[in-house]
Amino acid sequence: MKLRFQRVALVGKYQAPTSAGMSDSSRDALDGIARFLANEGCEVALEADTAANTGFTDYPALSVERIGLDCDLCLVVGGDGTMLGVGRQLAQYRTPLIGINQGRLGFITDIPLGEYPTVLKPMLRGEYEEDLRPLMRARVMRQGQCVFEALAMNDVVVNRGSTSGMVELRVEVGGHFVSNQRADGLIIASPTGSTAYALSAGGPMLHPTIPGWVLAPIAPHTLSNRPIVLSDSMEVAVEVVSGRDVSANFDMQSLASLQHGDRILVQRSDYRARFLHPRGWNYFATLRKKLRWNEGGY
């Protein structure tokens, strides 16, 4: 069967430190996958930082932008954090992504490392399930000016510093005042992020096809302050009323320090990440496996 993807880029989890910047297991995994892809007839490229940290010179090194412009597919080898970082950058190019899990839980990097040869072979020829995930656009406004802007796939989190007390946040949804919340922080999560930090804060899991967000307080002062499910068509505004060392995190990978009076505006982005899964994949099977439902015969 003819290849569906000719030019394939590899991105590795190079944050695992060794003297060379990447663990031996990660380097070996990338080497094996690159050789597999080449044997399948693909033109293989490496993301520039991945190439630098592996020391591999047999394949061209491309920036993420060039991957988006020139490659048919991006294979991410690592955990969900690696996929989030790459997925945000490639969403504007509509480049499909496949995740090979070298992390722990792996909700969106769902192919086990030891199974990639048998799983990838049919996927490279067009046998896959496509899964579109919306992104969030967040801006930090200070005295009417945007001082920071970022995309998020999982969540936008406004929270206190590690040594400070509660923060007070004024929350508006769709231009309507909701409440002033005193808590350790507030999470605005997408369906993808609803199984991450928001879940540990008591929020519900949203199916990926639901056009909604979860608004979940972190350790609220008032117990009646519960998570809310919102339409993602509405802008969420969070204003810092009081608190010390307050910050906004975007997928826990970029951070903005906040001042009193700052407003964080969160809107649905025009971009969506394109994840590809093996044929037969479904969301509920992922939940059942990752959250260990039905183990022990129940």
Swiss-Prot record:
Keyword Transcription regulation attributed: no
Spans through the membrane: none
Cellular component GO terms, alphabetical: cytoplasm
UniProt xrefs under PANTHER family: NAD KINASE
SUPFAM superfamilies in the cross-refs: NAD kinase/diacylglycerol kinase-like
Species whose genome carries this gene: Paracidovorax citrulli (strain AAC00-1) (Acidovorax citrulli)
Cofactor needs: a divalent metal cation
Cross-referenced Gene3D superfamilies: Probable inorganic polyphosphate/atp-NAD kinase, domain 1 (3.40.50.10330), Probable inorganic polyphosphate/atp-NAD kinase, domain 2 (2.60.200.30)
Reaction equation(s) it catalyzes: NAD(+) + ATP = ADP + NADP(+) + H(+)
Keywords per UniProt: ATP-binding, Cytoplasm, Kinase, NAD, NADP, Nucleotide-binding, Transferase
The protein's name in its UniProt record: NAD kinase
EC class: transferase
GO terms for biological process, alphabetical: NAD metabolic process; NADP biosynthetic process
UniProt-annotated location(s): Cytoplasm
Originating gene: nadK
Molecular functions (GO terms): ATP binding; metal ion binding; NAD binding; NAD+ kinase activity
